[in-house]
Amino acid sequence: MDFSRQEGGMKELAGRLREIVDGVEPRLMAVSASESLVPVLRGGWSRRQVMGHLIDSASNNHQRFVRAMLADALAFPGYDQAGNVRVQAVQEADWALLVSLWASYNRYLAHVLGQLPEDKLDTPCRIGGGETVTLRFVAEDYVEHLLHHLEQVGVA
């Protein structure tokens, strides 16, 4: 499947996210529970831990999208990615549950992205003390980040 970056507005980005989820979910469900425990890179996270990270990413970005629609500017804290994965004991979580939650959350985020008004896309957003970017960048970067990790686990 070709999930390459496409030009367009938020409705197109929302459609792209739905297409990614619909294409990848069956591939993730085909990964066995035992296979999901194996690190994808030497010394790195397992597929299960990557899924936990992607759920955290969805949760954090959901708040960013909504709060930026309600404000003239957004200052949002960063988060400890490795710490989140560790304290939630993602490695012990049920694989099918993680995949199902990830897919459902991203389908909902596609709905939210489709609601982003054009006049809010330039809302300045600062995350975790980084440089200021636009809400459009945050939304597009979310999908690119998602794809990076799906490629990392071999399903995109």
Language-model segments: residues:
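Extreme N-terminal tail/first-helix region
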Residues: 1-23
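A short small-residue
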Residues: 1-5, 82-90
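Short, contiguous alpha-helical
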Residues: 2, 35-81, 107-110, 124-156
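Residue-level recognition of alpha-helical structural elements
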Residues: 6, 13, 36, 43, ...
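Alpha-helix N-cap/loop-to-helix boundary motif
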Residues: 9, 16, 42-46, 53-57, ...
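A generic "alpha-helical surface" signal
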Residues: 11, 15-18, 48, 52, ...
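Acidic/histidine-rich alpha-helical segments that form the ligand environment
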Residues: 16-27, 85-122
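A glycine-rich, hydrophobic loop/mini-helix early in the fold
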Residues: 26, 30-31, 40-41
